[in-house]
Structures are given as C-alpha cells and as structure tokens.
C-alpha cells in the first residue's frame, strides 16, 4: 500500500511541474510542508452500543463516556502549489494524520474499585488536491479540498487491578478506505512562503469491526449473548464533521 502511495506522489509531482511550464505563470510553483491540528467527529455505533451495555452492569461505579469525536495532528507535504495569473490556486498534497480519544471509567470488583479506560485511535495516510481562488493578496478561498484516506483504527482497553494491569488491543483491517471533502480559507503571512489555513468539511469512514491478535472480533455476540442487538451496528458506522487548522511553509521549485 505504502509503495503504491509513494509512486503516486512522484507521478503527481512530475505532472504538476509539467503543467506549470504549460500555463506559464510567474513562478513554476512551490513545494513545501505543513502541520496542524484536526478535530474529527464520527458515529461509533457498535462501540457505543457495547459501552451502553457495559455501563448497565452492576459492577459499574463510574460509567465510560461514549465516543463521538477525536483530536490530533496532521503533517504533510504540498507536493506542488501554484497560483495562476487569473488567481486560481492548485495544490497536490499528501499527509499523515493521527487522532485519538481516551475515555475512562471505574468498575467495582469486591472491595476494590478499579480504573478502566478505552483508547480509540485513528491513523491514516492520505493523498489529495485542492483548488482555490486568490481574491486578495492576503486572503484566498479554498473552493474545494479533497483527499482519499487509507485508515487504520485501533482500540485499547486497559483495566488497572491491584498489582496488575490487563490490556486488550484490537485493530481494524489495514488501509480502510475513506475520503474527505471540504472548503476553507488561506491567510498569507509571507506571500507564497508562509500561510495559515483553516478547513471545514466532511470525512467518510466506515469500520465494520476491530480484531485482537488472534483474530477474535471486538463486536462478538458471544461476549454478551443475552443482549446481542448491539452487534447490528458497525464499529464505526460513519464519519462526520472535520475541522483543520494548519501552518504552510513553501519553497519555490525554481
């Protein structure tokens, strides 16, 4: 997967450079890096059904909150960013993103109360493009921002018992397909070299289930056979609203 991902990056870079020469704007374009913060909403239907069931058990002292959002960072490369003479901005890019959310609770076993946590993480490699319009020298409108995402989702359950810690880890299939689409604003700090970018949009993501190292699914009706209705939901049923703020740094190709 990563090999094909890198090959695609090279193809985009070469073709974008050729386009720059064809259209003949003042500079042949910029490459650069960026980093920022991401807020992501999602509907973890199956996971939250499991949590609701667990919170109803008699030994629950402090219930675990349900999962509906995560925060984290993204770092990436603008493989090519150029502004045409008519003000249109075109960018080809790739990035890595890490998001996480950790919810805690307490369960009572005998005379002791034990801390319990669930840590949900989203890691993805993405390739994308955007088209914008520079309507002033300082502010540009990112008309359309799109990316294809290859996601890896994991869940870690941790229970702290007296004298020991029990950890159960589950992972999704590798490279679960998803996509993001949005719009935003770019504010130039130093024209073409440094800018601040804000983006809002929607991210599509569906994860059927996650599995431990033995291949046992997390959403398994054997775990709670007396109430297996929660297994009707996918682990992550859908994505949702996404917001990103990032700092871009560019360097001229020539």
Model-derived regions, located:
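Extracellular/periplasm-exposed beta-strand and loop segments of Gram-negative cell-envelope proteins
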Residues: 38-71, 97-124, 148-178, 205-244
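Outer-envelope beta-barrel architecture signal
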Residues: 21-31, 84-92, 125, 137-144, ...
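Sec/Tat signal peptide C-region and signal peptidase I cleavage site
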Residues: 16-20
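Positively charged n-region of N-terminal signal peptides that target proteins for export
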Residues: 1-6, 21
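Sec-dependent N-terminal signal peptides
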Residues: 4-15
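Residues on the lipid-exposed face of transmembrane beta-strands in outer-membrane beta-barrel proteins
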Residues: 37, 73-82, 94-96, 127-133, ...
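Intrinsically disordered, low-complexity segments enriched in Gly and acidic/Ser/Thr residues
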Residues: 190-214
